[in-house]
Amino acid sequence: MTYVGRMPHTTNTGIPDSGIPDTGIPHSDVAADRARLLEIVKDKAIVHGRVTLSSGRDADYYVDLRRITLDGEAAPLVGRVMRELVRDLDFEAVGGLTLGADPVATSMLHAAAAAGERLDAFVVRKAGKAHGLQQRIEGPAIAGRRVLIVEDTSTTGASPLEAAEAAREAGAEVVAVATIADRATGAAEKFAAAGLEYRHVYGLSELGLA
């Protein structure tokens, strides 16, 4: 079975010939997916108005990416775009803290399957169950496996960091954290301090919020 991790395409010199990893998908299609997803995010997910973020800070906008990750047109784009974002990383499963991470991970699972590849998904509960198997992580076992932690967006980094800790406690190796949008509110610095590689698809400038 083929897993998703691959090395980027290189020239004869061993240097990548493009910023976009070679996935077998035409680069024009990758760019089109990214551009269309950005259009939908701007149209459906960005809410202007005074709001209080999870960090306690006030902001003049809110990025509600559940309107995207649970949208019938956008969800497949999320899967493909996120998959391309981390194509050069070697991992076998993807997941994060419920609820924001769940549709992102599932979209990536389906995108991999559509490409004839294998990618498992898992869900990290906010607390372990008090009944049944009393497990905190749902889905295929991740012990001894390399995993990617995902989230739709992160304000403080708390949710991905909690998910990463839970995954490690379950015996997994966490290779990186990836989100759809970065709000530039301190999450990147928290991930760096924790020794986690961090990637995101869109920044504030691309979202028209800088």
Predicted regions and their residues:
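Short acidic, glycine/proline-enriched helix-loop-strand junctions
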Residues: 88-89, 104-119, 189-206
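Short, glycine/charge-rich flexible loops or terminal/linker lids adjacent to PRPP-binding catalytic cores
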Residues: 105-148, 155-162
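Short glycine-rich phosphate-binding loop at a beta-alpha junction
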Residues: 90-100, 176-178
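Short helix-loop-beta connector
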Residues: 87-92, 142-144
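PRPP-dependent phosphoribosyltransferase catalytic core
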Residues: 2-12, 26-40, 165-210
